[in-house]
Amino acid sequence: MDDFRSICLLSLAMLVACYVAGIIPLAVNFSEERLKLVTVLGAGLLCGTALAVIVPEGVHALYEDILEGKHHPANEMQHVMESEKVAEIAVVHEYGHDHSRLHAYIGVSLVLGFVFMLLVDQIGSSHVHSTDDPEAARSGNSKITTTLGLVVHAAADGVALGAAASTSQTSVQLIVFVAIMLHKAPAAFGLVSFLMHAGLERNRIRKHLLVFALAAPVMSMVTYLGLSKSSKEALSEVNATGVAMLFSAGTFLYVATVHVLPEVGGIAHSHRPESTGGKGLSRLEVAALVLGCLIPLVLSIGHHH
């Protein structure tokens, strides 16, 4: 019951914090220039979050058991007698086997997340291409895919938190929760600023934000309640928390690189005055993009395990 109470509190905190972070761009009235800067900053936050927070957290979650197992025997190695060294070698060999298996998990999870979003994007765009205005169709599809990608990513986060809660280890739950919050708040901010620039009405943006904010808490509750005892044991065997986070990192990378960054490049090309040759971002926008990439990195460095 304690686990259930903690997952409820964590889910509620996640929902509120995510929604509040996303409302900030809506609450402040930006001029067109400021809105462009905020959009570029949001794009940087999405990219920096994917690379500096989600991928390392997923890898850490995968390797956690092995790392913990290795630290304990390491100090005792000096005191181990000759007869016991054979057993140690066998254990080290086993770790090597586990490492190669986990390497495969990392690549497969990331690629599957990326390919999943690619397929969702293609299926979505095939329905929209029949309209008369292909530019408007592509723009509308981009908004939907960006939101859908982040919702899928948030749902995978929820599965990771639900799987972590089912381990009954408070430290694991808190680590996963902090990791999720470190990127959900910037992602919510980035999503809303992107949708604002894309010209969506404010009410619809709020709906998109609410769906995004709800995805992780709902999935964490469903995962926690839906797992039987045997399922929990099976999930801990295959490190479901790490796999889910890496899958979500793949979806996040797709959204950040394929949709948001090119859109930001498009902003620059369409609004740049003739004197600059119509190429690239302004220095201030480049600075905002770099700052956005660095903020999650600084936050993740401050977040020690």
UniProtKB/Swiss-Prot annotation:
Gene Ontology terms: cellular component: mitochondrial membrane; mitochondrion; nucleus; perinuclear region of cytoplasm; plasma membrane; trans-Golgi network
Glycosylation sites: 29, 239
Membrane topology recorded in Swiss-Prot or TrEMBL: Multi-pass membrane protein
Superkingdom field: Eukaryota
Primary localisation category: Golgi
Nuclease in keyword set: no
Entry GO MF terms: androgen binding; G protein-coupled receptor activity; zinc efflux transmembrane transporter activity; zinc ion transmembrane transporter activity
Transmembrane segments: 7-27, 35-55, 104-124, 144-164, 174-194, 208-228, 242-262, 284-304
Subcellular location: Golgi apparatus, trans-Golgi network membrane; Cell membrane; Cytoplasm, Perinuclear region; Mitochondrion
InterPro entries with a match to the protein in the record: ZIP (IPR003689), ZIP9 (IPR045891)
Reaction(s) catalysed (UniProt annotation): Zn(2+)(in) = Zn(2+)(out)
Transport recorded as keyword: yes
UniProtKB keywords: Cell membrane, Cytoplasm, Glycoprotein, Golgi apparatus, Ion transport, Membrane, Mitochondrion, Nucleus, Transmembrane, Transmembrane helix, Transport, Zinc, Zinc transport
GO biological process, one term: bicellular tight junction assembly
Pfam families with a match to the protein in the record: Zip
Biological role stated in the UniProt entry: Transports zinc ions across cell and organelle membranes into the cytoplasm and regulates intracellular zinc homeostasis. Participates in the zinc ions efflux out of the secretory compartments. Regulates intracellular zinc level, resulting in the enhancement of AKT1 and MAPK3/MAPK1 (Erk1/2) phosphorylation in response to the BCR activation. Also functions as a membrane androgen receptor that mediates, through a G protein, the non-classical androgen signaling pathway, characterized by the activation of MAPK3/MAPK1 (Erk1/2) and transcription factors CREB1 or ATF1.
Protein family membership: Belongs to the ZIP transporter (TC 2.A.5) family.
Cross-referenced PANTHER family: SOLUTE CARRIER FAMILY 39 ZINC TRANSPORTER , MEMBER 9-RELATED, ZINC TRANSPORTER ZIP9
Protein name: Zinc transporter ZIP9
